Amino acid sequence: MRPALVAVAHGSRDPRSAATISSLLDRVRSLRPDLDIRLAFLDLCTPRLETVLTTVSRAVVVPLLLGRAFHADVDLPGAVARAVAARPELDITVADVLGPDARLEAVALRRLAEVGVSTADSGFGVVLAAAGSRQAPSNAAVSAVAHRLSQHTRWQVVPAFACAARPTVSDAIATLQAQGAHRIAVASWFLAPGLLPDKVVRQACGTALLAAPLGADAAVAELILHRYDGTNQGRVARDRCRPESITAYRQAHDRRAGAPGRAVRDCHHHAGLPR
C-alpha cells in the first residue's frame, strides 16, 4: 500500500485561504483517485499536522510552500519530529517545498494573461509580489524568479515583498515607472488569497493591474503529485523527520538568521500561505 499524501499548508485566519487550498486538494484527488490524500495545517487552521499524523502509519508530507524559510526549515520539521517522537513506528518522509518551480512560474504568467498582460508588450513593468522573509536566500529565490520571468517576456520584472524585506510593492512600482514603464502589473507569488495578498493590493494603490494568486490550478496539483512521487524515487532524505533532527534544524536556522541560540520568525508567515 502506498503511503498517504499529507499536504500541509501554513494556515490562515482568512477563510478564503483554506477554501482555496481545499479546492486545490480536490484537484489533486481527481488526478490520483486511488491515493489517500489528506490536508493539514501548521497553524491557525485545523486539522493540525500533528493530529493528521496520528491517523496514518506511512505518509509523505508535501509542504504547500513556495520557498524555504522558517516554516519549511523549523516549524514543519518540528511538527513532524514531535509526531514521530510520540509514535516511533511512524514511517514519514518530508518532500521538498513546491517552489520555486517552472510550473509555478507558468501559472503566474497565466494569471497575468487573465488580466490582459501580454508577454509581448514591452510597455508593461511587472512587480512579482511575494510574502518576504528575514532569510536572505528566500528573498533571493524570489528575485531569481523575477529575473527568469523577464528573460521569457518583454517586460521589466522586479521583485517586491509584503513584509520583512524590501522593496515594498509601492517602491517597486515607483522603480518601474522611473525606468519608463507605461503600465504596471502585479504578479502574485502567493498560493492563496489572504491578508498579505490584500496588503499587496492596497500597496498597488489602484495604479496596477492585479493578477490573482496561483490558486487551485491543475499545474499546481500536478506539482504536488510530482513532489510526492519524487520521495519514492529516493530524492528526499528521510532523516529530516527524525526526532533528533530538530535540534540540528534549529541550530542551522539560528546561524542563517544571525541570532545564535534563538530562531527568528518571519513577519507573519512565509512563502505563499498568508495568515
Language-model-detected regions and their locations in the chain:
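Active-site-proximal alpha-helix that buttresses catalytic centers in soluble enzyme cores
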Residues: 1-275
